[in-house]
Amino acid sequence: MKALVRVAVTGAAGQIGYSLLFRIAAGEMFGKDRPVILQMLELPDEKAQAALKGVMMELEDCAFPLLAGMVVTDNPDIAFKDADAALLVGSRPRGPGMERKDLLMENAKIFTAQGAALNKVARRDVKVLVVGNPANTNAYIAMKSAPDLNPKHFTAMLRLDHNRALSQLSTKLGKPVANIEKLIVWGNHSPTMYPDYRFATADGTPIIEAINDQAWNANSFIPTVSKRGAAIIEARGLSSAASAANAAIDHMRDWLLGSNGKWITMGVPSDGSYGIPEGMIFGFPVTTTNGEYSIVKDLPIDTFSKTYIDKTLAELEEERASIAHLLR
């Protein structure tokens, strides 16, 4: 057995948390040879804490061989203590009549506090994935609130968008998703994201040779991927939970265990690539090895793509400006 890993999960009794915890305990995130301690955080109210205790009871009843221990708490300093990985799933959802700027402010308070707690008690090499929306800006806030931690280790989840785009291409081409490579989702995890298959291949053949159809790209593919979350809410009455948890597993597994040379999409702090301001958390194509990621460099950006990338960048800049006063 490899060394024990401590993984903190916020919003642990929520729908995504419930879909995620059992898969982590089964070894799907860190490997089948890595024991885990789950450190679960929920809101400090009686109902949330009771639900969290129920989740813990179910985890006990699964008798997972790799589950070496559990912590349930409403205190971030306890949840993040010595954490090797932190999945920040919990966030304030948008309520009726709530403006986007109000949502940003409410979440800024949460992620400022969680970033500070990580800075105080987590391992110095902790790897952080923000799932709670608005994920990119929440990750940026947490990163800025943890000045003693490696900023490269604060990431936002765009893997759900990446997986959604893979599925749409698979259906269009009649090819298995496993045979499709070099897909990218640029930018913000929001409807402004830009799924880009210009470099993608299926069975090694460029996809643009099979789908040379800019109308389908602009009028079907991009809108379907970018509005998929809303379509699921309309159909199910609830937001994506199992698919979001699955994407979080994919993101962390590939980051920690390596992507074997394959391109994946991660929201990571920009190093200035593609004209994205340094430090902005932005969806890029990356490869991963030995627990670190590298942005795929020097891809040509055509006029069509630049229009979409500029739009998602403008949204992120607006979000960042709206919370800047909280980070001074």
Curated annotation (Swiss-Prot):
UniProt: NAD(+) binding residues: 11-17, 107, 114, 131-133
SUPFAM superfamilies listed in its UniProt record: LDH C-terminal domain-like, NAD(P)-binding Rossmann-fold domains
UniProt cross-references to InterPro entries, sorted A to Z: L-lactate/malate_DH, Lactate/malate_DH_C, Lactate/malate_DH_N, Lactate_DH/Glyco_Ohase_4_C, Malate_DH_type2, NAD(P)-bd_dom_sf
Catalysed transformations (reactions): (S)-malate + NAD(+) = oxaloacetate + NADH + H(+)
Keyword Oxidoreductase in annotation: yes
Catalytic-site annotation from UniProt: 189 (proton acceptor)
Binding site for substrate: 94, 100, 133, 164
Keyword annotations from UniProtKB, A to Z: NAD, Oxidoreductase, Tricarboxylic acid cycle
Family (UniProt): Belongs to the LDH/MDH superfamily. MDH type 2 family.
Protein's recorded name: Malate dehydrogenase
Organism whose genome encodes this protein: Xylella fastidiosa (strain M23)
Lineage: Bacteria, Pseudomonadati, Pseudomonadota, Gammaproteobacteria, Lysobacterales
